[in-house]
């Protein structure tokens, strides 16, 4: 239970968290730019324009199907259209009321065709979030359709339930004072937006997302949304450019511009959610494994294989989220290294999304891993193009000697590398034992 003392303690620690918050935002901004966030927002804007009518039709139909929510339908409509078009909500609502009534007259095939645009919107949003969360594989089609249907049906019910609870709270507060009611009504849109964004970041990406990270991203997106509403309204009022150019049709570009703003805010909130685990892991996460030195790549790969071997002893695999926790080098590095190890046939992903080792680590060596990751000196160095100078043969001799030395030193099997020292035995004695078993001289 959150007591007043704990709340005061959290508030006292808040100023100390500001540098971290600034750092997360500074990390998220270039991440958003590199992921082409504005271009994706533009694409989602036009897809949303086509999908809104069937989406709103289903949403309001669900409200009508539950008599208890019937009286809340108008409140829900007001909240939805205020979020969709804060400055021209009345005009947009009038248009969509007409569109929704026209959609009711469609035949079965027409309804199916119209509904496909809603499915395409969901797939587009899923693809955008998968890019942000570095999910390389989409869900199976059946799972995707079921997730879409769950979001489409559950969200209106949650909205209705929250409005019902809020109405009861407002009724109780009216007896105590007007200020409390005003504050609650002012905060309600932002709270609902934060809840919706949090669920979106949790449910849609094909990636395990911690609820705390999704909550932080949802709150950040909701705050940006409320600030954007105010700024958008002030801009439209102060600079009536669209009304001057388009006249009565100005509602169309204004509505498109606002949808573009909404999707930019949503995608940036998703970037913050995806950035948090990377930020906790440290600065190394700003690059993928290709940005690391060779020795660092090998260390990350060996750390992943070590965790997979430990899990294999229990007969289980490890999910990516667990790996990111146990090997805290950041999501980018973990994802990239898993892809490289999978391409080299060292690991594989199971149907339930867990990762397992596919090679017998008792026989495999560090040198095998080095070659699989492309870090060895390969190729015929004595014949490169038309080069045939004497220095070329001498350089080839040096490379061959270096490769032979590396092969000798790194020919340690993972069973020996991962061996725990017996109780009371220093790690140096274990190193000596490894040398004796493998016949190596010098340091490992």
Swiss-Prot record:
Cellular component GO terms, alphabetical: plasma membrane
TM region(s), chain numbering: 49-69, 103-123, 145-165, 186-206, 219-239, 248-268
InterPro entries for the chain: UPF0761_bac, Virul_fac_BrkB
Keyword presence, Cell inner membrane: yes
Major place of residence: membrane
Alphabetical UniProt keywords: Cell inner membrane, Cell membrane, Membrane, Transmembrane, Transmembrane helix
Compartment(s): Cell inner membrane
Region (Disordered): 423-444
Topological category with respect to the lipid bilayer: Multi-pass membrane protein
Family: Belongs to the UPF0761 family.
Protein name (database record): UPF0761 membrane protein RC1_0578
Organism ancestry: Bacteria, Pseudomonadati, Pseudomonadota, Alphaproteobacteria, Rhodospirillales
